[in-house]
Amino acid sequence: MSFIADKIVMDGLTYDDVLLIPAYSEVLPRTVDLSTKFSQNIELKIPFVTAAMDTVTEAKMAIAIAREGGIGVIHKNMSIEEQARQVAIVKRAENGMIYDPVTIKRGSTVRDALDIMAEYKIGGIPVVDDEGYLVGIVTNRDLRFERDMAKHIDLVMTPKERLVTTNQSTDLESAAQILQKHKIEKLPIVGMDGKLIGLVTYKDITKAKDKPMACKDAKGRLRVAAGVGVTVDTLDRMQALVDAGADAIVIDTAHGHSAFVIEKLREAKKRFPGIDIVVGNIATGEAAKALVEAGADAVKVGIGPGSICTTRVVAGVGVPQLSAVYDVAKALKGTGIPLIADGGLRYSGDVVKALAAGGYSVMIGSLVAGTEESPGDTIIFNGRKFKSYRGMGSLEAMENGSKDRYFQSGTADVKKLVPEGIAARVPYKGTLFEVVYQLTGGLRAGMGYCGAANIEKLHDAKFTRITNAGVMESHPHDVTITSESPNYSRPE
């Protein structure tokens, strides 16, 4: 037996190795359906998930992507309390009817009210007594010109007697009519006993009309996921995230096909049976089967394809991303478990290829790291604006808490860490909306060429393998680019 026959078990192809073959189409790009599943019980309006990276997704990014129809995964490089707080910010960013509104106790001060408004980015707070009975409401208009920070809010609030309220049987449409009729912005929901049980705001109703494709839960709140590692406090972190309202938990490791991850997944499903748990990362069908058997509600595919990942050169391990996605998709066929293709995406065409190979959604990092909503630092270099972007396997990220992702949580000495990623910078790209608009536009175009009316139909598309000459031919060539396109930059 030769080495090739004995040891090479598969061909490894990635996005630049193939093109999709155009097919007969009756599908216009503007009519395609981009809805898909993130996990077994969470639907998305667009197939985009922002990565659980400390220079990509915190509350601001998660809110922005959910408003566009995707979902964000808040990273874990922070304390349990801070990550739970980030989740809570997303869940409170928009609501249909708010059934657990932020409140302030009677007797609190103007300073207390201003601090709460700043923390939760809200413009008004119901005032309650110690038993939870509504006694008034205080808004930023009440506090705008107030100079005495120690003054009790009872002296500046609008008392209950002057408030318009409603009961819990009022639906959202009726609530909107009440708000309009009385020209008010906040409508408290009060029980028969006088206790505050909820709140409807004009701002939330307006947001719902402005972003009809937003990814929301049954209560009208934006959906959000949160990442955890495999450590001694994993279940404690998960409990805090679930309590804060997280819609899904992502067990995020460099090697999802390991005994430690599978055991932690089983423990998590037993303790939290009502929440979807996504697990990654993996690169083989065998790994997918093991995770599904252990209870995974979705799997995340990608070992080493990311622009800031060095796993393949440091460890010599990985599977080119397109082949990995296809291998996992084959293994998952008939299970109903969605596949998230994570990493290696440079252009919208790569997104089309990832979904055509069997993905339900794609996880994006570098494509959105340069946006206004990312938490990365802004850098000016040679007169141009950039944002910092680093792999969770970079030395800097590992020092801040991601060591466990690479099974190095027991290494205390920074000099003994073995990084599997780098720190970098990416060009500033404006708002997330602008980037997502171009990505969805390219995806719609690709689906139109393939005659695929939805993502499920896109899974039937066929590929042609191309040479390096084919790759060169695919990019602009034999010219000097004089005007940059918003969705294309020449590969370095």
State what each model feature region is.
Residues M1-Y24, I104-K105, N167, S174-Q177, ...:
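Alpha/beta catalytic cores of nucleotide-metabolism and tRNA/nucleoside-modifying enzymes
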Residues R30, S79-A88, E146-A150, D171, ...:
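Active-site-adjacent beta->alpha loops and helix N-cap segments on the catalytic face
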Residues R30-L44, A51-M53, E82-Y120, V127-D129, ...:
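Bateman/CBS regulatory modules and CBS-like beta-alpha motifs in cytosolic regions of diverse proteins
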Residues E43-T50, G96-P101, D217-G227, A268-A283, ...:
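Short beta-strand/loop segments at the ligand-binding rim of alpha/beta enzyme cores
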Residues K60-I63, D236-A244, A283-V301, A341, ...:
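Catalytic cores of alpha/beta
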Residues R67-E82, A246-S258, D297-A315, L345-I379:
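Glycine-rich phosphate-binding active-site loops on the catalytic face of alpha/beta enzymes
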Residues V73-N77, T103-I104, G124-P126, T165-T166, ...:
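Catalytic beta/alpha-barrel core
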Residues I74-S79, I122, P126, Y133-M149, ...:
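Short beta->alpha transition motifs characteristic of CBS
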